[in-house]
Amino acid sequence: MKPCIERLPRHLALAACVLALTCLPPARAADPALDRAAAAMKVDEVRTIRYSADGIGYTFGQAFRPGEAWPKINIRAYSRSIDYGTASMRDEIEFIRGEALGGGGYPHAAPQRNVELVSGGYAWNQVVTAPVPGSRFVAGRIHQLWITPHGALKAAVRNSASVRKATREGRTYDVATFAEPGRFTATVFIGQRGLVERVESRVPDPVLGDTPVVTVYSEYRDFAGVPFPTRITQAAGGHPTLALAVREVQPNAPVDIVLPDLVRAATERVTAEKVADGVWFIAGGSHNSVAIEMKDHVVVVETPLNDLRAVPALAKVREVVPGKPIRTVVNSHGHFDHSGGLRAAVAEGATIVTQALNKPYFERAFANANTIRPDALARSGRKARIETVDRKRVITDGVRVVELHHVADSHHSDTFLMVYLPKERLLIEADSFTPGAPNSPPPATPNPNHVNLIENLERLKLDVEHILPLHGRVVPVKELYTAVGRPSP
């Protein structure tokens, strides 16, 4: 997603680049090996495709402890529809948690259904009938579209892949290597029958930097004259992410994906609400931050998601607290949606404060550059400074006190921190409690994360009046107690 049309607004230039690359008429491969593979796979005949499957998935970036495997989900039904001509894809996934520990925000007992889309340079989720823009998903979904078996060959031809012979485990492959500029790099392994058997790709990631992804296609069958694998496995960042058994394939199925106007017009919105003297709630999107003004500097709690969110959030902090450097950024926990903006914080010159288990993981991650799409950290040339919290740490300038506490015994993350301002009686937390709509009834069964948060507040004897959640709105603490069916203290 490089801005190849410099005078357009960034989001329009992005879309124009993608469409310019993906809406061209089919090109013929210059290399005979790609020609043979295209003929074997019926690539030019496949304009759209839909396939359904079931199996196992894993929630990338949501490990219970840093470095552990991604949490497992059981996929009951999976449907993917692709229009290669418009670079559009729709995934419909029905699943249930496969294990208790780890993140993802999924119910602990009930099944969930996700509808995830991408078209050109835009991504969104469909929640009932409402589209929810998701710019942070564009890169990942475009990558997934173009590493499908037919997509990989189309992308290899379009990007003038270099082709060589290679032997692996006694088998000879035609190996095509190409780059989708600003998106990903890929190496496609084509077997002796001309079928795509493996794609090794690298994608930019807000936490890990350039990240290896390995996708394996096997047990091909003929579907209406088109070969397609019935087994798909994938790993990313060193751990499995997918294991599918494909049940049905429909080449050239009707695929009608319309980009909603709301998604096309969406921009990154950042707001600031003063909740106490020198304390600002930075909101406006799916993830929040908090700015805490000290005597001669600013402490920021959370730089989430990626540069697209973190950079304007930090700019908003400088706007509401002018003239003081952002010296410290506190990370609530290691899950990637909450740590994806830490590279931007390092580029800002801030010291990262995180739970002790995260430090070696973050040090390795931040030392691995994003070269495919350079981020703020890569451009800055700075090195990360990381300090830690085990169970408790206090930041003070002699006037304001900021307490950092480990959230013990959580099922969500073993590296959870919450931030407490005793004078202001404010609690800042992520994922332990996300407030529902105002006046909504409590769930029939209390959320274990809510119960765990109350247990920690009571164990530590924290006197809280309001909660500043890193998802959702500022609420009085009584809403937490109401959510678990208990009177507030």
Pin down the residues of each PLM region:
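Bacterial N-terminal signal peptides that target proteins for export
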Residues: 2-16
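N-terminal mature ectodomain segment of secretory-pathway/periplasmic proteins
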Residues: 32, 39, 43-131, 159-164, ...
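Flexible, processing/modification-adjacent segments and terminal tails
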Residues: 32-35, 107-186, 192, 203-209, ...
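Gly/Pro-enriched, hydrophobic low-complexity segments
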Residues: 169-260, 417-422, 429-430, 435-436, ...
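Divalent-metal (often Zn2+) His-rich catalytic cores of metallo-beta-lactamase-fold enzymes
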Residues: 233, 454-489
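Zn-dependent metallo-beta-lactamase
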Residues: 241-295, 393
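Conserved beta-strand hairpin/beta-sheet module of binuclear metal-dependent hydrolase folds
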Residues: 273-319, 416-435
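Active-site metal-binding motif and surrounding structural segment of the metallo-beta-lactamase
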Residues: 308-353, 459-463
